[in-house]
Amino acid sequence: MRRVYTNRRAHHEYELLERFEAGIALTGSEVKSVRAGGVDFRDAFARLNNGNVELEGLYIPTYTEATYNNHEPRRTRRLLLHREEIGKLKRALEQKGLTLVPTRLYQKGRVFKVELALARGKKLHDKRRAEAEKTLRRELREL
């Protein structure tokens, strides 16, 4: 079974510019916990640290069947990207107002991947305009 977790708030809070696929380094108990469910993207973001991309704030609940080897739910997790992609992200993040937001966590084959989006935060009036356009499209579709 292929479980996909999405960050629904990212589409509302940010204007998503460009997407990247990254591997994620997980421990054994984290993998089992992700398969069991309950991943939470609230407050999750990615950042560059010493040439590595790290994912902060992603909540993966502790695995109930694990013993003393259980993981910390909100630990910093390393993301695996090609060197060229990291360079591209570094240049893009130097621009004012851009951030790196996780949008999806999914399984591809036997490994887990995170979809990252280069994003710019929306202002309140932008959110209202997007909501009005969405409502208008919904009404037109109903006619």
From Swiss-Prot:
Q: What is its main location?
A: cytoplasm
Q: Does the keyword Nucleus apply?
A: no
Question: Can you list the disulfide-bonded cysteine pairs?
Answer: none
Localization recorded for this chain is: Cytoplasm
Primary role: Required for rescue of stalled ribosomes mediated by trans-translation. Binds to transfer-messenger RNA (tmRNA), required for stable association of tmRNA with ribosomes. tmRNA and SmpB together mimic tRNA shape, replacing the anticodon stem-loop with SmpB. tmRNA is encoded by the ssrA gene; the 2 termini fold to resemble tRNA(Ala) and it encodes a 'tag peptide', a short internal open reading frame. During trans-translation Ala-aminoacylated tmRNA acts like a tRNA, entering the A-site of stalled ribosomes, displacing the stalled mRNA.
> What NCBIfam families does the annotation carry?
PRK05422.1, smpB
The protein's name: SsrA-binding protein
Q: Which organism is it from?
A: Deinococcus geothermalis (strain DSM 11300 / CIP 105573 / AG-3a)
